[in-house]
Amino acid sequence: KEMQNRITADIAAFRLPRYAQIPEVGLYLEQVVRYINARLAPLGEPELTGSMVSNYVKQKLVPAPQKKLYTAEHLARLLFIAVVKPVVPLEGLRLMFSIQEECYPLQTAYDYFCDEFENMLGAAFGVAPAVEGLGETESDAKDLLRSTISATVNKVCLDRYLEEYRKRREQAETIVGKEISLL
């Protein structure tokens, strides 16, 4: 129960920054990496690295920075990539961005992603009941995004529980080891 409470507290406090909250001033690569990793730390997923960001630029998933500076557009795309990359391959991300560009402005799509991700994450961890019908329209693009978020949330759930069990086992082994050394 203690493990569940610790995870639930992390998830209850988790919020993705909305587009209007993302820094508008340009950030350098290392600042971008720190900003994104700080926001996503409660999810327990692998951290974003500078070389990963450079690769996403090279793969044209993220526009090239202007004078080595990354803007809110870059950060929104990188936050999305960092959250869903454990379940969506690069080619899938490319297709999703293409669909998004055809259907919704980045700010609208990103904010909807944040709302839906937090909604499903909270429901999966029992923090809050799922809110049905977020957003004003139904579309294939939103269905695709919801499926992506659902898969991502399930992976986050699994990873967090496995990590907590791993920590618990290590602690138990440490205690047993100390007891044996006392004999």
Can you say where each PLM-predicted feature lies in the sequence?
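Basic helix-turn-helix/winged-helix DNA-binding cores
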Residues: 1-101
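Intrinsically disordered, low-complexity, charge-dense segments enriched in Lys/Arg
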Residues: 105-183
